[in-house]
């Protein structure tokens, strides 16, 4: 079942203007990254990041994150774009940042990574596999690619936290959930936000 996207009506000197809520938030440099990370969603997030950076790269972009994770390639495309643009990207985790969501949320500008008090973080090793009827050589290729991907993601998590690569590897061996305080101690965020004090 779908959900209704609210419309916001604004008054101006030239009359009324209606926006869907996401377009209105974009005017205030707010991007909502919600739901599974997949190619279509990533393309939309990337386009919004590029648009806001081209509009004014001296102002921060606010990326609100609530995702169970998803595609590694789609998520890394978002992370690469966040690093590519000149604007600082503030990340605000609400609900959860799990799996690829953790990579994205922790890749915000250092000092500007936030989390709401009841949100959660999850790190784990990447998942994938070969389909039924796959040849043994293809399975070996998939396994090798998964190991490479795991190393790359763990390096990003180590760079984005105050933990060693070895600690990340150990903690990501199985699902490792963290509440806001644990995430702050881990170094993935810089502050737990009780109210909206973003600048």
UniProtKB/Swiss-Prot annotation:
Originating organism: Lactococcus lactis subsp. cremoris (strain MG1363)
Function of the protein: Cleaves peptides in various proteins in a process that requires ATP hydrolysis. Has a chymotrypsin-like activity. Plays a major role in the degradation of misfolded proteins.
Name listed for the protein in its UniProt record: ATP-dependent Clp protease proteolytic subunit
Induction annotation: By heat shock.
Catalysed reactions, as listed in the record: Hydrolysis of proteins to small peptides in the presence of ATP and magnesium. alpha-casein is the usual test substrate. In the absence of ATP, only oligopeptides shorter than five residues are hydrolyzed (such as succinyl-Leu-Tyr-|-NHMec, and Leu-Tyr-Leu-|-Tyr-Trp, in which cleavage of the -Tyr-|-Leu- and -Tyr-|-Trp bonds also occurs)
Record EC number: 3.4.21.92
PROSITE patterns associated with the record: CLP_PROTEASE_HIS, CLP_PROTEASE_SER
Record-level GO cellular component terms: cytoplasm; endopeptidase Clp complex
Statement: the UniProt record of this protein carries the keyword Coiled coil: no
MF term (GO), any: ATP-dependent peptidase activity
Residues annotated as transmembrane: none
Keywords: Cytoplasm, Hydrolase, Protease, Serine protease, Stress response
CDD domains: S14_ClpP_2
């Amino acid at each position: 079942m779908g959900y209704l996207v609210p419309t916001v009506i604004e008054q101006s000197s030239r009359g009324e203007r209606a926006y869907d809520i996401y377009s209105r938030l974009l005017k205030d440099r707010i991007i909502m990254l919600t739901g599974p990370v997949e190619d279509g969603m990533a393309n939309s997030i990337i386009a919004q990041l590029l648009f806001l950076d081209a509009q004014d790269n001296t102002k921060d972009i606010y990326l609100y994150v609530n995702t169970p994770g998803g595609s590694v390639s789609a998520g890394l495309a978002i992370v690469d774009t966040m690093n590519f643009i000149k604007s600082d990207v503030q990340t605000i985790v609400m609900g959860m940042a799990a799996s690829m969501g953790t990579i994205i949320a922790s890749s915000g500008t250092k000092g500007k990574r936030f989390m709401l008090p009841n949100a959660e973080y999850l790190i784990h090793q990447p998942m994938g596999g070969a389909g039924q009827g796959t040849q043994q050589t293809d399975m070996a290729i998939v396994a090798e690619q998964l190991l490479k991907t795991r190393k790359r993601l763990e390096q990003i998590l180590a760079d984005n936290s105050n933990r060693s690569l070895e600690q990340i590897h150990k903690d990501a061996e199985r699902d490792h959930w963290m509440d806001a305080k644990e995430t702050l101690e881990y170094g993935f965020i810089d502050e737990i936000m009780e109210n909206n004090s973003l600048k």
